């Protein structure tokens, strides 16, 4: 049995195949996922698992260099936005690097998901609970 934190074989495999600057999306239950992008559906029911639960597990395994977030989260989901920023700050300290945070419109965000290696769908049902993670290197 795998000893690492990620037990889901699809997520573990996807993270292990990421190269520098490749992207991976963690999203809420409502984000449209392009047919051309690999979909890893973790949603069981509304809120399970939460966006932050999925993000926490993914970022424990993935080296993150940058993050892209929809600008609209600031107004429409400020509590999650603050939680997300705190998580990224803690991740920076743990990884020993600076994580660049970029904001874009939700429409542009949806277009960028088509370029990602995969989209991991959580059961989150709050607005704009989505992030594009850009892979870094550990050396």
Swiss-Prot record:
The entry's active site is 20 (proton donor)
Q: What family does the entry list?
A: Belongs to the RbsD / FucU family. RbsD subfamily.
Under InterPro entries, the record lists: D-ribose_pyranase, RbsD-like_sf, RbsD_FucU
- Name recorded for this polypeptide: D-ribose pyranase
Which UniProt keywords are given for this protein, alphabetically ordered? Answer: Carbohydrate metabolism, Cytoplasm, Isomerase
Cellular component, GO annotation: cytosol
GO molecular function (one): D-ribose pyranase activity
């Amino acid at each position: 049995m795998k000893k690492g934190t990620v037990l889901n074989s699809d997520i573990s495999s996807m993270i292990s195949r990421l190269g520098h600057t490749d992207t991976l999306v963690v999203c809420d239950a409502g984000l449209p996922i392009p047919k051309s992008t690999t979909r890893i559906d973790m949603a069981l029911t509304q809120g399970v698992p939460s966006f932050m639960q999925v993000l926490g597990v993914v970022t424990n395994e993935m080296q993150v260099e940058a993050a892209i977030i929809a600008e609209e989260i600031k107004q429409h989901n400020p509590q999650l936005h603050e939680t997300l920023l705190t998580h990224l700050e803690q991740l920076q300290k743990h990884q020993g690097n600076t994580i660049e945070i970029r904001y874009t419109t939700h429409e542009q965000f949806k277009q960028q998901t088509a370029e990602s290696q995969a989209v991991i769908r959580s059961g989150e049902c709050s607005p704009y609970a989505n992030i594009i993670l850009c892979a870094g290197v550990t050396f």
